[in-house]
């Protein structure tokens, strides 16, 4: 067999091959649009030249503190400039950024710090109580840097002598950072919600982050210089990679410390916000704003919404208010959104019920994803594309995680058969669009955050008066879903709903506490298995 001429003497070399990374997006934006506003935070403004310089200073300062390739830098930050800077400054050293969910409780944060072997922690003073409590519990003893927000001062305790702005000032503005030697190198670490025990550490690589950044711009319709409002927490899947996406098109980041109606309307009106993302809580907050909180919106604002699909009434109200909606679906393991409900123009000719049905579907694969399907998890065969046969939603491609940190067994299980197993059950239609039907792990998605029903049930079961309990999702216009607990009490014992809720508040992060407690017989099969599908129907009327 003669050699393939296209393989002869045509080799990869530095001239024709460089590892993909989102880091060079910022370098280019600073070169081409040095004076364009990159970040707005209160009265603070940073141009792209300043943004790039601050990231280089951060990288330099971290290097001076001993941070290098393969080290983990953890952050407990709100959607503020340091969070954006960490997305570039940390990986500029070959280090890995670990963003911590500020809504977690201290034991989970301590576990993450230990599991990640965190070498340095940047913490906002708003979250000082959480960080301090976690550090007491953790074996890891990272160096600490405090962020004192000059725009929204916080009264939390300062945990170290190192102030973030002083750290930035100490860095070299001309620091020569390095491209990753391999695009497969880790760039960030995100933890799952820990639905079956301790959370798993999801590792992203430079290649996936770069491709996801491009894909976001395509799917969100972002042209040059969009204005993006940070209603989505950047600790969640690295803000779906939008911290990097905006540098591709030299967009403006509008930081939002708290998701509040007045601040959102002011940002949209004053800064000309063109795009924002988030869970249904963002939409309900906008819609439920008082007249005093509202501002007229005279331009198109595109909203990417994910998590549990909001009620049709919310979608209709958002559209009537002038927002353009796009439904997305994904997981921590897929860098955030991996499917998009691409709207076809012919659907506009459907009646209201038909259009509503189309909106409930999770959609087709993201442009950066190589394959999306629904398989029978036992046979690994594709289910019929009939919109009725249920299987497991599975993904394949470059925006699937590298794997789970220090968990070879879980990684192998997740990738069994050459597909990433989502754990979500759904159907696929003849046009290739998928729709979720259930979550095999009974995850409750509230305000964009995953809540394990098992974790909540475990806490309730520990109450001495509880005989049986089950926790399911109850639809909620504001949060998307909230936990609803069904409880059977032990004979001759009593407990009120308020008592059980107080019990939960002492043992769970606040957002995980059920909003409703229903005292009723918990339906079970003949073998004793709780029938959660029945409870979900009951919860709708609870």
What are these regions (language model features)?
Residues 34, 145-146, 157-165, 169-191, ...:
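Conserved pre-ATP/AMP-binding loop-to-beta segment of ANL
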Residues 269, 301-303, 310-328, 332-434, ...:
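Conserved AMP-binding/adenylate-forming
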Residues 78, 123-132, 232, 259-263, ...:
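Adenylate-forming
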Residues 17-18, 23-27, 35-80, 84-88, ...:
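Conserved AMP-binding/adenylate-forming core of the ANL superfamily
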Residues 104, 111, 121-125, 276, ...:
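AMP-binding/adenylate-forming catalytic core of the ANL superfamily
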Residues 52-60, 169-174, 188, 202-223, ...:
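Conserved structural elements of the adenylate-forming
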Residues 64-65, 92-169, 491-493:
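Structural core segment of the AMP-binding/adenylate-forming
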Residues 210-227, 235-275, 289-290:
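Conserved AMP-binding/adenylation subdomain of ANL enzymes
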């Amino acid at each position: 067999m003669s050699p393939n001429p296209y393989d002869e003497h045509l080799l990869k070399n530095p001239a024709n091959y460089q590892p993909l990374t989102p880091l060079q997006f910022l370098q280019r934006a600073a070169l081409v649009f040095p004076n364009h506003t990159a970040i707005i935070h209160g009265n603070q403004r940073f141009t792209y030249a300043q943004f790039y310089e601050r990231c280089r200073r951060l990288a330099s300062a971290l290097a001076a503190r001993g941070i290098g390739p393969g080290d983990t830098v953890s952050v407990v930050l709100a959607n503020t400039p340091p969070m954006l800077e960490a997305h570039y400054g940390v990986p500029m050293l070959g280090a890995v950024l670990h963003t911590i969910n500020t809504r977690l409780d201290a034991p989970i944060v301590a576990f993450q710090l230990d599991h990640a072997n965190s070498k340095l922690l940047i913490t906002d003073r708003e979250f000082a109580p959480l960080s301090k409590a976690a550090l007491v519990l953790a074996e890891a003893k990272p160096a600490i840097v405090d962020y004192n927000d000059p725009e929204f001062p916080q009264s939390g305790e300062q945990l170290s002598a190192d102030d973030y702005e002083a750290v930035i000032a100490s860095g070299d503005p001309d620091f020569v950072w390095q491209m990753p030697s391999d695009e497969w190198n880790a760039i960030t670490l995100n933890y799952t919600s820990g639905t079956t025990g301790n959370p798993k550490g999801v590792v992203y690589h430079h290649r996936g982050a770069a491709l996801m950044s491009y894909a976001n711009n395509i799917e969100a319709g972002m042209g040059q210089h969009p204005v993006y409002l940070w209603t989505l927490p950047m600790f969640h899947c690295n803000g779906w990679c939008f911290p990097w996406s905006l540098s591709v098109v030299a967009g403006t980041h509008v930081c939002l410390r708290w998701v509040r109606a007045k601040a959102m309307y002011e940002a949209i009106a004053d800064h000309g916000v063109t795009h924002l993302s988030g869970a249904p809580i963002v939409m309900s907050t906008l819609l439920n704003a008082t007249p005093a909180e509202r501002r007229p919106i005279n331009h198109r604002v595109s909203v990417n919404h994910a998590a549990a699909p909001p009620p049709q009434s919310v979608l209709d109200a958002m559209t009537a208010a002038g927002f353009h909606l796009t439904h997305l679906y994904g997981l921590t393991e897929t860098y955030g959104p991996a499917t998009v409900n691409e709207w076809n123009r012919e659907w506009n000719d459907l009646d209201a019920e038909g259009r509503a049905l189309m909106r409930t579907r999770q959609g087709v694969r993201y442009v950066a994803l190589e394959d999306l399907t629904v398989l029978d998890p036992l046979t690994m065969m594709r289910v019929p594309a009939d919109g009725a046969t249920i299987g497991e939603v599975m993904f394949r491609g470059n925006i699937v995680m590298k794997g789970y940190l220090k968990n070879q067994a879980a990684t192998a299980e997740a990738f069994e058969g050459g597909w990433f197993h989502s754990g979500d059950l759904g159907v696929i239609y003849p046009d290739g669009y998928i729709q979720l039907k259930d979550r095999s792990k009974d995850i409750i998605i509230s305000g964009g955050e995953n809540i394990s029903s098992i974790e909540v049930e475990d806490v309730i079961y520990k109450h001495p008066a509880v005989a049986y309990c089950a926790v399911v999702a109850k639809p909620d216009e504001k949060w998307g879903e909230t936990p609803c607990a069904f409880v059977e009490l032990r004979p001759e014992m009593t407990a009120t709903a308020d008592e059980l809720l107080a019990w939960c508040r002492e043992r769970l992060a606040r957002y995980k506490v059920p909003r409703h407690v229903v005292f009723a017989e918990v339906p079970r099969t003949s073998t004793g298995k709780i029938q959660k599908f029945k409870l979900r129907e009951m919860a709708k009327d609870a």
